[in-house]
Each structure stands twice: as structure tokens, then as C-alpha cells.
A protein has these predicted regions:
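C-terminal "cap" of GNAT-fold acetyltransferases
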Residues: 3, 113, 120-127, 131-133, ...
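Conserved N-terminal entry element of GNAT/NAT acetyltransferase domains
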Residues: 1-17, 155-156
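Hydrophobic pocket-lining residues that define ligand/cofactor binding sites across diverse proteins
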Residues: 107, 112
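Acetyl-CoA-dependent GNAT
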Residues: 4-6, 16-88, 100, 106
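Residue-level detector of beta-propeller blades
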Residues: 57, 137-138
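Conserved acetyl-CoA-binding loop-helix of GNAT-fold acetyltransferases
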Residues: 86, 92-105, 128-132
Length: 156
């Protein structure tokens, strides 16, 4: 957990019983993977961290330990950083940078040597952030049913 000096800003692990509060950050009703992610949290494969201001859910990021895609995870070596999202009205305030730095440090503490992240090609702000943090190696440049995206890698 990280606390700010004035103790109203924290980054904390998500408790499964609070998963529904993520609705404050993203629309859980229209996201088809909402229940899949809930199951991954329950199994311990998806470690979700929440950025809070005065207890309000503002940002979310996750570490996925094992995925079916070796570009994203290699057990014991590579972790997948997933669901980096900040509530729209709080964007461009450095919250994404704080979340990403926290997740990278957490992955390092857990013994991972690499972190992978996926990003839509048209998400210029996220691409800039990820490159600034050293996600410069392109593992995949292509598309799926959701559009064109990159899988990027950083050695940590």
C-alpha cells in the first residue's frame, strides 16, 4: 500500500467483495470480460490494485500471473500488466504514472524479470506513458476483434 503525505491518496489491493466498486472507473455492465476478471481475482491469478482518493475508486491496474498467451506471461519470469485505467475526469494528472510505477515495483518484488503490456495503437496517451516507462520492445503488432494493438515488453 502507498499513502500520500496527506493520507487521502492510496494504492491498495482490491478486495474481491469490493469488485463492484470498479464501476466508478469503468462500465462493468458493458464489458464482456467483467465476470472472467472476477474469476481470475478470486483464483489469485489477477492481482488488482486500486488508486483511491478519499476512498473513491479513481484508477485500476492489475498484474496477471499466468495467461494463455506467452507474449504476456512466462511463469516465474514475465508478468502481464492489465487494465491500466483511470477515471476519465482524473486523467492527465500523473495517476497513470503512479499506478504503472507501483505495478512495476510490485512485479519486481515478486521476482519477475519482465513485464508485458497491451495497448491499442490509437491510444496515444497510453503509448507515450508506456514508452516513457521503458516498454519499448514490440512483441506483437497486429489486430484482434477489438482492433489494432501492440504487445510491449519491459525488462525490470
Amino acid at each position: 500500500m502507498i499513502r500520500s503525505k496527506n493520507a487521502d491518496i492510496t494504492i491498495e489491493p482490491l478486495k474481491l467483495e469490493e469488485y463492484g466498486r470498479c464501476q466508478n472507473i469503468w462500465n462493468m455492465k458493458t464489458q464482456p470480460l467483467t465476470e472472467t476478471w472476477r474469476s481470475e481475482i478470486a483464483s489469485g491469478n489477477r492481482l488488482v490494485f486500486i488508486y483511491k482518493i478519499n476512498g473513491e475508486f479513481i484508477g485500476e491496474g492489475a498484474l496477471v500471473l499466468e495467461a494463455d498467451d506467452p507474449d504476456y506471461t512466462i511463469p516465474g519470469r514475465r508478468v502481464y500488466i492489465s487494465r491500466m485505467i483511470v477515471k476519465k475526469e482524473y486523467r492527465n494528472r500523473g495517476i497513470g504514472s503512479k499506478m504503472l510505477a507501483f505495478l512495476i515495483e510490485k512485479a519486481k518484488e515478486m521476482g519477475f524479470a519482465e513485464a508485458a503490456i497491451g495497448v491499442d495503437k490509437d491510444n496515444a496517451n497510453a503509448l507515450h506513458l508506456y514508452r516513457k516507462f521503458g516498454f519499448t520492445e514490440v512483441l506483437f503488432d497486429g489486430a484482434d476483434e477489438y482492433g489494432e494493438f501492440y504487445k510491449l515488453l519491459k525488462r525490470i
